[in-house]
From Swiss-Prot:
Coiled coil: none annotated. The keyword Nuclease does not apply. It comes from Pongo abelii. GO terms for cellular component: CST complex; nucleus. Component of the CST complex, composed of TEN1/C17orf106, CTC1/C17orf68 and STN1; in the complex interacts directly with STN1. Interacts with ACD and POT1. InterPro entries: CTC1, CTC1-like. Keywords: Chromosome, DNA-binding, Nucleus, Telomere. This is CST complex subunit CTC1. One of its GO terms (biological process) is telomere maintenance via telomere lengthening. Its main location: nucleus. GO terms for molecular function: single-stranded DNA binding; telomeric DNA binding. Belongs to the CTC1 family. It is found in: Nucleus; Chromosome, Telomere. Component of the CST complex proposed to act as a specialized replication factor promoting DNA replication under conditions of replication stress or natural replication barriers such as the telomere duplex. The CST complex binds single-stranded DNA with high affinity in a sequence-independent manner, while isolated subunits bind DNA with low affinity by themselves. Initially the CST complex has been proposed to protect telomeres from DNA degradation. However, the CST complex has been shown to be involved in several aspects of telomere replication.
Length: 1217
């Protein structure tokens, strides 16, 4: 026991010695009172607070507490903390529990803080005061916040018993922490209480002070004392010239008459922390002044003005003789805050906000740099229209605020659903209590951008609805691009003329449309003083969200969702056509389809945004953001491909684009009846990409320091490597031809692995060197090295594989490029023979002197200098084969080139083999894509059609080969089918260039209406047309039912195929009729199939269905009308009534009638067999025979049949349906 008692004094003694050392070092020089023992006073002060709650744990000193200086807090305290000297552990626990169930309370530290409370950040001039508070000791100054400030505390030494310290955020290395002083500080030295005035202070009340302002002859030299209730307190306005705030005094609250006072003396700005609305004050020695640009005079404080609490016994109202000419009319009464609903203007478009006062707690931080918070879990709070930099650091969940004269805006739109409170410069935001919670760990995008958000409000003059949308859009953009594409501080930096903000540039197109620049700048004095009140928050219009910036992954997912939601087999195959298709044709029609989505298809409209990268794995361009990548097809403009590699790494923003979704479906529908059953879809996948013109996009370079090191998928294109910009060599070449991007085999170089090489994705180009090698000289290139054979065309074969595949989309024939090899010069670098990679024979045939493999670290640059302009002009045109060469049997050159518009794209059977064997997947069907194109030629009015086939290894086809697109094909292989039709196929040398995208809106162009005789004009006649004609006779009629699986004839609904039973016993009906028609100029044989047969026979759907049901039993009925009567062919016995019915029908006026026929030629324009010449035919006219040349009949395929306007409905059986 004795030893224990002896330890206590020694512990206290050690604590007292440490305290004395700390006080002498940290506080003594700062004390101005002479001959005072500072240490005992501080110790007594600490003891008083320590013992104030009756706590005595065996010692009168807080031995567990240690003194801390300002410098120690700033240097060593890296985590938020709080210290409560007079609290026990249970008291702290109760305090911490009030932080809320989801709150993270401030941890407690046992620290003693002393310092001088001041409004000077250092020993500076008085003019540097800006209304901020600081705690200062010998080691430094720390900013602080105090809720209930007494002006008599300034400049005195205090012990702070309850406080919290919040260090700067980790991302803010240049920032400083701050103190939050919870309770009133305890003075170390007794504060002198100033005695009241000996005589009452003569004061003016608001009514008299207001009238005095309007007297012309009594304005000069007037200094008066004003008294009244504080009815309004503006925000603290800080401009480049000065800082100030404006308060209004009235007789009562709310006041009928008020008078405004401007406080702009630096030493008096701290009054803003003292003033509380509803409290009565006296302001002494005020003078009258006039604000520049204002008509009225106002009261303004002087250097000697003081702020006092109004005590009725200490003041006396000053009686004045208010006579003289008035400068202006009586001011309007101070408007009271409105509690009514938002008012609307007569047009119903604009709304007017409500002014009110509100007290509440911050429950969430929505966007701290933008000044957006959540109040009481149901209101939004926007502080952006005030200068709230000092308030921002204390704003976190748990802070209680009092809002004076704040605007309430409801239904602002722009993606915001909750009502929003927003104070303008007239209102005030006052702290009522600090938060018990630790600051949240904000992501970088929630930490940067305060100056940019201020720029949106103060320079762009955005209204609140548009500002809320802009902040949300910037958050979306930061989430898309940061931090992997660029740093948050780069993206959200303040925009200046020499350094524009990347974030703001992305919003400018939308902001310029909704809020054009040039709006009047906010006038703070007018906003605070003018009646009626005008500010950016007073009047607003509900904003329909103009656009959004989805991530590329979200855009891709939305495109797939829309594509599969709209995938309807019954809509892709209309019922009249689908009901006659066998299973194989039915599923092949559904195997490929596509959907084009425009930005307007989304709500709100989508804006495409991403960094342009070139993929070395797929050889295509991609847009990339944080969520992933999306393939893209870009054209500089119509018929002009993308050819400048400098675009790699740039940020691309496009409001006009096409989101393409190609749907690949593997299905096994037995027949059209099961199209509504999704269970027959075995596999479905989609290819999603975007296509747009660069002319419709905004291209922004990304700051270089933000780009990460190159990866194989996104290599850098900057030729200035680690060796610096002064090392490297290059050579110009003219690109003559580019081959297809596909997997190729290359010879194994000597010394390589003995394993069998696998085909690699690659492509080759054929070009011509333009001059010799050039070396880097400064920022440019030196003169070309002389060549021994300058006059000879030096052709070169360049091979691209590996990472160099990324250049595929930028290389186009007719352009001049610079091939750049970084690093120290290497002799003969571009003259090395690469024959080990390719056989010499193809090079000799192409006339190439050498073959060169492009290395992974080499780069390409588009050359467009004036020196090579003649070369560009001479090679600008794309190669085109003549129509004669295309549609002829001349195979001197089987490679053809042409431009065409794609009419259709379908999947079909392979041209050569129907099956291919694949390891582990025997019997998998090969796919072949058929493009039907309309040739672009000036040689004929109606362009001929041609089929282009794409097979492995050119599958899947390149991006953009869609119906409606214009495409240039180079070096397709021309072939002739067994039916003498010309078609083309892809080969390894084929080059495809998309010239234009499918039109956004499809315009249905009616077929031309012609006479049949016009079809004999060869190339001048259309392939498809409409004519008005008359059915002369029926040549033949076939009605049959076939198995939907194997297409064999079905009798009584059963397949007649010999062999294994078909997996499905489903039959479909088919029909063919051949008609002879004439229109007075010529006659033609027309073949109609399936549902067109019903139209030709004039049968309604019910009659047609009944007729087909009669045919189901025999399975097949064939009628030939070669002469008089009808000859019957059938696979089973058919009753004579059916034969008689069909014969009667086909020879009746119901069929032999005038019609409007839409048709296409059975003979394709690509058929190279010469036309049948006119034949000599004998005619009998009475007893005299005649011989004449008769043209062969035209052969047409029916597209549709419509009844002629001149048809008589009496003889048409369909009229009864």
């Amino acid at each position: 026991m004795a030893a224990g008692r002896a330890q206590v004094p020694s512990s206290e003694q050690a604590w007292l010695e440490d305290a004395q050392v700390f006080i002498q070092k940290t506080l003594c020089p700062a004390v101005k009172e002479p001959n005072v023992q500072l240490t005992p006073l501080i110790i007594d002060c600490v003891k008083t607070v320590w013992l104030s709650q009756g706590r005595n744990q065996g010692s009168t000193l807080p031995l567990s507490y240690s003194f801390v200086s300002v410098q120690d807090l700033k240097t060593h305290q890296r985590l938020p903390c709080c210290s409560h000297l007079s609290w026990s552990s249970s008291a702290y626990q109760a305090w911490a529990q009030e932080a809320g169930p989801n709150g993270n309370p401030l941890p407690r530290e046992q620290l003693l803080l002393l310092g001088t409370l001041t409004d000077l950040s250092a020993d500076l001039e008085q003019e540097c005061r800006n209304g901020s508070l600081y705690v200062r000791d010998n080691t430094g100054v720390l900013s602080c916040e105090l809720i209930d400030l007494d002006l008599s505390w300034l400049g005195h030494l205090f012990l702070f018993p309850c406080w919290s310290y919040l260090p700067p955020a980790r991302w803010n290395s240049s920032g400083e922490g701050h103190l939050e002083l919870w309770d009133a500080p305890v003075p170390v030295f007794p504060l002198t209480v100033s005695p009241g005035p000996v005589t009452p202070i003569p004061v003016l009340y608001p009514e008299s002070a207001s009238r005095l302002l309007r007297l012309r002859n009594k304005l000069r030299g007037v200094q008066r004392n004003l008294a009244g209730n504080l009815v309004r307190l503006s925000a603290l306005v800080k401009s480049k010239q000065k800082a100030y705030f404006i308060l209004s005094l009235g007789r009562s609250h709310p006041a009928v008459t008020h008078v405004s006072v401007i406080v702009q003396v630096p030493a008096q700005l701290v009054w803003h922390r003292v003033l509380r609305p509803g409290t009565a004050y006296v302001l002494t020695e005020l003078r009258v002044s006039k604000i520049r640009g204002q008509r009225q005079h106002v009261w303004m404080t002087s250097q000697s003005s003081r702020l006092l609490l109004l005590k009725p016994e200490c003041v006396q109202e000053l009686e004045l003789e208010l006579e003289g000419p008035l400068l202006e009319a009586d001011p309007k009464p101070l408007p009271t805050p409105s509690n009514s609903e938002d008012k609307k203007d007569p047009e119903g478009l604009a709304r007017y906000s409500r002014l009110l006062s509100y007290s509440g707690a911050v429950t969430g931080v929505l966007n701290e740099p933008a000044g957006l918070y959540e109040l009481d879990g149901q209101l939004g709070l926007c502080l952006a229209y005030q200068q709230f930099r000092g308030l921002r650091r204390v704003m976190r969940p748990g802070v209680c605020l009092q809002l004076q004269d704040v605007h309430l805006l409801q239904s602002v739109g722009g993606g915001t659903r909750r009502p929003v409170l927003a104070p303008c410069l007239r209102g005030a935001v006052l702290l009522q209590s600090f938060s018990r919670q630790k600051p949240g760990t904000h992501s970088s995008r929630q930490a940067y951008g305060a100056s940019l958000y201020e720029q949106l409000v103060w320079e762009r003059q955005l209204g609140l609805p548009l500002y809320l949308w802009a902040t949300k859009a910037l958050e979306e953009l930061a989430g898309k691009l940061c931090p992997h594409v660029l740093r948050h501080h780069q993206f959200l930096q303040h925009s200046s003329p020499g350094s524009p903000s990347l974030g703001l540039q992305l919003l400018v197109p939308t902001l310029d449309l909704l809020a054009p620049p040039g709006s009047p700048v906010r006038n703070a004095h007018n906003e605070i003083l003018e009646e009626p009140h005008h500010c950016p928050l007073q009047k607003y219009t509900r904003l329909q969200t103009p656009s959004s910036f989805p991530t590329l992954a979200a855009l891709k997912e939305e495109g797939q969702r829309e594509a599969w939601a709209s995938f309807d087999p019954e809509a892709l195959l209309p019922l009249p056509e689908a009901s006659h298709l066998p299973s194989c044709q039915l599923n092949r029609h559904l195997a490929w389809s596509w959907l084009c989505l425009l930005p307007s298809a989304f709500h709100p409209a989508q804006v495409l945004l991403g960094v342009l990268v070139a993929s070395s794995h797929k050889g295509c361009l991609q847009l990339r953001d944080q969520s992933g990548s999306l393939p893209c097809l870009l054209l500089a403009k119509h018929s002009q491909p993308l050819s400048d590699p400098r675009l790699i790494g740039c940020l691309v923003r496009a409001e006009r684009f096409q989101l393409i979704v190609e749907r690949d479906v593997r299905s096994s529908f037995p027949s059209w009846k099961e199209l509504s059953m999704p269970g027959f879809i075995q596999k479905q996948q989609a290819r999603v990409y975007v296509q747009f013109f660069l002319a419709d996009a905004l291209i922004l370079p990304v700051p270089r320091p933000s780009l990460h090191s190159a990866t194989p998928s996104t290599p850098q294109t900057d030729p200035t490597g680690p060796e610096g910009p002064h090392l490297g060599q290059s050579r110009l070449f003219l690109l003559c031809h580019k081959e297809a991007l596909m997997k190729r085999n290359f010879c194994v170089p000597p010394g390589a692995s003995p394993e069998v090489p696998k085909p690699v994705l690659s492509f080759c180009v054929l070009g011509s060197w333009l001059g010799g090698t050039q070396r880097k000289e400064g920022t440019g290139w030196g003169l070309p090295e002389p060549q021994g054979n300058d006059d000879k065309d030096q052709k070169v074969h360049l091979i691209f594989f590996g990472s160099s595949v990324r250049w595929f989309e930028f290389l186009h024939p007719g352009q001049v490029y610079r091939l750049v090899a970084p690093g120290p010069p290497t002799p003969m670098l571009f003259e090395k023979d690469g024959s080990s990679c390719i056989s010499r024979r193809p090079l000799e045939l192409a006339g190439c002197a050498s073959c060169l493999t492009v290395q992974d670290n080499w780069t390409l640059e588009l050359e467009s200098s004036q020196d090579i302009q003649d070369v560009l002009d001479a090679n600008k045109a794309l190669p085109e084969s003549s129509l004669t060469d295309l549609l002829s049997d001349n195979f001197t050159d089987s490679l053809v080139s042409f431009s065409a518009e794609i009419l259709s794209r379908t999947l079909c059977e392979p041209l050569v083999a129907s099956l291919w064997m694949k390891l582990g997947n025997t019997g998998t069907m090969r796919r072949c894509v058929k493009l039907t194109v309309a040739l672009e030629t000036a040689e004929c009015e109606f362009p001929p059609h041609l089929d282009v086939y794409i097979e492995d290894p050119h599958l899947p086809p390149s991006l953009g080969l869609l119906p409606g697109a214009r495409v240039h094909f180079s070096q397709l292989e021309k072939r002739v089918s067994r039916s003498h039709n010309v078609y083309c196929c892809f080969r390894s040398s084929t080059y495809v260039q998309v010239l234009s995208f499918p039109p956004e809106t499809t315009i249905s162009i009616p077929l031309p209406h012609i006479y049949l005789a016009e079809l004999r004009q060869g190339g001048q006649s259309p392939f498809q047309a409409t004519t008005s004609c008359h059915i002369v006779s029926v040549f033949s009629l076939q009605l049959f039912w076939v198995c939907a699986y194997c297409t064999s004839i079905c009798r009584q609904g059963k397949c007649t195929r010999l062999g294994p039973t078909c997996p499905t016993q489903t039959a479909v009906s088919q029909a063919i009729i051949r008609l002879l028609v004439e229109d007075g100029t010529a006659e033609a044989v027309v073949t109609c199939r399936n549902h067109h047969v019903a139209a030709a026979l004039g049968l309604c759907p019910r009659e047609w269905a009944s007729l087909l049901e009669f045919v189901r039993v025999p399975g097949r009925v064939v009628l030939q009308f070669a002469g008089p009567g009808a000859q019957l062919e059938s696979s089973a016995r058919v009753d004579k009534p059916m034969t008689m019915f069909l014969w009667t029908l086909c020879t009746s006026p119901s069929v032999l009638r005038p019609i409007v026929l839409s048709f296409e030629l059975e003979r394709k324009p690509s058929k190279i067999v010469p036309l049948e010449p006119p034949r000599l035919q004998r005619f009998q006219c009475g007893e005299l025979p005649f011989l004449t040349h008769v043209n062969p009949r035209l052969r047409l395929s029916c597209l549709s049949i419509r009844e002629s306007e001149y048809s008589s409905s009496l003889g048409i059986l369909a009229s009864s349906c």
